[in-house]
């Protein structure tokens, strides 16, 4: 997983974003200081690979829009995306990604 520090991506208020398996962060030192950040983004990298990279964003947007239509706020809709749910729920589980089953995010649908 490649990590790139810059001042543009991600948007303010977010520490990191994973785009096609490349993690962009505003503060590399802060990102690296917490293993949960790394595990969260690495989970997304594995999800990208499972969905052949091009499938990740359509799946992500589908669930976000579906959640918005259910009346959720933008932030609630984001947190209820199955891809995000897996990453958040497991980010504090050491070695989770070493034993993770493919398409594990589907159990959060």
Language-model-detected regions and their locations in the chain:
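Nuclease and nuclease-like effector domains acting on nucleic acids or nucleotide cofactors
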Residues: 1, 35, 51
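Metalloprotease/metallohydrolase-associated module, dominated by Zn2+-dependent proteases
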Residues: 2-15, 55-109
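Short, solvent-exposed loop/turn segments at secondary-structure junctions
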Residues: 9, 29-30, 52-53
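Catalytic Zn2+-binding segment of zinc metalloproteases
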Residues: 42-59
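Short pre-active-site segment immediately N-terminal to the catalytic Zn-binding motif
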Residues: 13-18, 22-38, 79
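Short charge-dense sequence patches
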Residues: 8, 34-44
């Amino acid at each position: 997983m490649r990590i790139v520090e810059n001042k543009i991506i991600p948007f303010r208020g977010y520490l990191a974003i994973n785009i096609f398996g490349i993690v962009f962060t505003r503060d590399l030192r802060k990102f690296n200081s917490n293993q949960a950040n790394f595990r969260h983004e690495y989970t997304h990298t594995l999800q990208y690979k499972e969905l052949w990279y091009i499938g990740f964003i359509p799946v992500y947007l589908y669930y976000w829009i579906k959640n918005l239509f259910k009346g959720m706020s933008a932030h609630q809709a984001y947190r209820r995306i199955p891809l995000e749910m897996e990453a958040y729920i497991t980010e504090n589980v050491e070695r989770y990604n070493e034993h993770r089953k493919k398409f594990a995010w589907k159990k959060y649908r």
